[in-house]
A protein has these predicted regions:
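Membrane-water interface segments at the C-terminal ends of transmembrane alpha-helices
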Residues: 3-35, 53-179, 183, 212, ...
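Transmembrane helix boundary and interhelical loop/hinge segments in multi-pass membrane proteins
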Residues: 40-43, 131, 181-195, 214
Length: 236
C-alpha cells in the first residue's frame, strides 16, 4: 500500500522513457554525434544549414497552415455529421433507433480508419493527378483532352491537396470519437431541451451538446493536430 502513490509516476516514466530514447536518437545525430559514421564531436552545422535555408520560413508557415486548417475542417465536418445523425435519430419513434444507427455508422467508419495514411495518399494522388483517373474520366466523357492539363493538383504551393487528404482521413476518426462520447453526456436530452427552447437541431448541438462533448474528444483533436503538423508520407 505504501507504493500505491508511486504507481502514477512509474506509469508516466514507463511511457516517457521510450519517447526520451527516441528523442535522443534524433537529437544526437542532429548535433553531429554519430560514431558509426565518424561523427564524434558535437556541433551545430546541421542546425545552421537548416536556419540558413531560404525555404524554411515558407515551409514552417505552410506546415502550420495546412495542419491547423485540416484539423479545423475535420472537426467541423465531424460535428456536422454527428448533428445530422442525431437529427435522424430523433425523427423516429423507436427508442433504439439512435443506438442502431450509431452502431451502423461506427461499423462503416472502422474500415476507413484502418486504411493507412500512405495508402490513402497514394490512391488520392492517382485520382487527382493531372494525368490521373479523374482527368481521364473527364477527358473520355466530356473534354476530349489528348494531353494532361497543366494543373497543379498535387503538391500545390498552398497545400490544398494535403489539406484535402488529411480531412478525408481524419474526419472519420473524429466522428467515431464523437459518436463514442455522445452517450456519456446524454446528448439527446440536451437536444430536446434546446428544441423546447425554440432552437433547431444544429443550433442546439452547437450551444448545448458541443460544449459538453468537446472535453471528452479534446485529446483526439490534439492527436489529429499533432499528426497533421508532423506527417511526412502524406505530404510526399
Amino acid at each position: 500500500m505504501r507504493l500505491l502513490p508511486a504507481f502514477p509516476i512509474l506509469t508516466q516514466l514507463l511511457f516517457l522513457l521510450p519517447i526520451a530514447a527516441g528523442l535522443f536518437g534524433v537529437l544526437l545525430p542532429a548535433l553531429g554525434y554519430l560514431p558509426d559514421l565518424g561523427g564524434n564531436q558535437f556541433h551545430f552545422k546541421i542546425f545552421n544549414q537548416l536556419l540558413e535555408h531560404p525555404a524554411l520560413p515558407h515551409a514552417v508557415l505552410l506546415t502550420l497552415f495546412s495542419g491547423i486548417i485540416a484539423t479545423i475542417i475535420s472537426l467541423s465536418l465531424a460535428v456536422l455529421l454527428a448533428a445530422m445523425l442525431s437529427r435522424e435519430s430523433l425523427s423516429g419513434n423507436k427508442k433504439n433507433k439512435m443506438t442502431s444507427l450509431f452502431v451502423i455508422v461506427r461499423r462503416g467508419l472502422i474500415p476507413l480508419i484502418a486504411v493507412p495514411h500512405a495508402a490513402m495518399a497514394l490512391g488520392l494522388a492517382f485520382l487527382l493527378a493531372p494525368s490521373g483517373w479523374l482527368v481521364r474520366w473527364l477527358s473520355f466523357l466530356l473534354m476530349g483532352w489528348e494531353t494532361p492539363p497543366e494543373w497543379v493538383t498535387l503538391q500545390d504551393p498552398f497545400g490544398l491537396s494535403l489539406i484535402f487528404g488529411l480531412v478525408l482521413k481524419e474526419t472519420p476518426y473524429l466522428l467515431l470519437m464523437l459518436l463514442a462520447a455522445l452517450p456519456q453526456i446524454r446528448a439527446q436530452e440536451y437536444i430536446r431541451i434546446g428544441q423546447s427552447l425554440g432552437y433547431g437541431n444544429f443550433r442546439s448541438w452547437l450551444k448545448l451538446v458541443l460544449p459538453q462533448v468537446y472535453p471528452l474528444i479534446r485529446l483526439p483533436v490534439f492527436a489529429v493536430l499533432a499528426f497533421s503538423l508532423s506527417v511526412v508520407d502524406v505530404a510526399l
